[in-house]
Amino acid sequence: MKKLILSAALLAASLASQAQQGPLWMRYPAISPDGSTIAFAYKGDLYCVPAQGGEARQLTTNAAYDSQPIWSPDGKKIAFTSNREGSLDVYVISTKGGAPTRLTTNSGKETPIAFKDNDHVLFSANIMPTAQSNLFAANEFSQVYEVSTEGGRPKLYSVLPMENISINKNGQVLYHDKKGYEDAWRKHHTSPITRDIWMLDNGKYQKLTTFKGEDRNPVWAADNQSFYYLSEQDGSFNIYRRNIASGKDTQITQQKKNPIRFLTSSDNGLLCYGFDGEIYTVKEGGQPQKVNISITTDNDEPSLIRKVQSWGATEIALSPDAKEVAFVMHGDVYVTSTEYKTTKRITDTPQQERNLSFAPDGRSLVY
């Protein structure tokens, strides 16, 4: 009887622990202008949750991949990107839910950056760069366009790449630039092409940061004289506040191990961001608070996906006796026989394996 009670207690503790853990890898959190609600992407759909935490409400249910929610200034609409028509397009949906409206129809990739006002969305795309541009027309160096929330023909807003745009009530624009092809998820990057923050005010561009590493993701503070942003100046991405006139920084967070991503701010100064797969809020001078979120939804993804691929190997190495071939697929190492239909997976890691070669005896691999 005691063993039965103990087993039941352990089971209950285990279930409670799992419930407390909550969902992980919720991405692109965006806090509403009034600071009451957070929109985020999870497993290809959009959700909304109270800023203090609780049960998340599913906003989109399409089988396609929906991501990168952006709030309108009045908090009534959310723009997002989705590949439900093949390529990534910009859509807008009521915060109450319902059927979204498709705003872009180009065959390329369009992602929303900000609302210019309640009725116009700014988005990045490669549609019609001007002949005067000295930038190569590539996806990595997209332009910025604006489109009505009712749809219609897009209008060129900026030929320069402008990412993570934040517009205050005076019409001043903050953004971070893009100078090269470096992966946006790379950490500890220092080079001449790292991102810097700029301000566009009445047609004049002003560079606001000069750190040799990454400065990115600016959002206006409530006073319109300073802004919050992410920087790696202390070794990991943390939140800073910078006064534009003095250039003085105030560090808001002190994370050391993992980077902070996806910074947004409400009109009342509540900051929201992603950290280590979860969502946090913080006010200047306070301590970060994890937003405890529960999601109740059907599991529409199979636990195991069988894929047969005849292409996509990034590297290949032939054994000394020519009876085996090693190759890299999706970052992992595989070995296949040249005489039989046998393929064996050698590695299963979240890291990327590369530079394959067989040992002289053909019995081991170096990578």
Residue ranges of each PLM-predicted region?
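A flexible loop/linker signature enriched in serine peptidases of the S9 family
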Residues: 20-23, 41-47, 55, 60-66, ...
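Short N-terminal segments immediately surrounding and downstream of signal-peptide cleavage
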Residues: 21-35
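Residue-level detector of Asp-centered blade-edge/turn motifs that repeat once per structural unit
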Residues: 33-34, 73-74, 116-117, 168-170, ...
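Acidic/charged, solvent-exposed loop-and-adjacent secondary-structure segments enriched in E/D, K/R, S/T
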Residues: 290
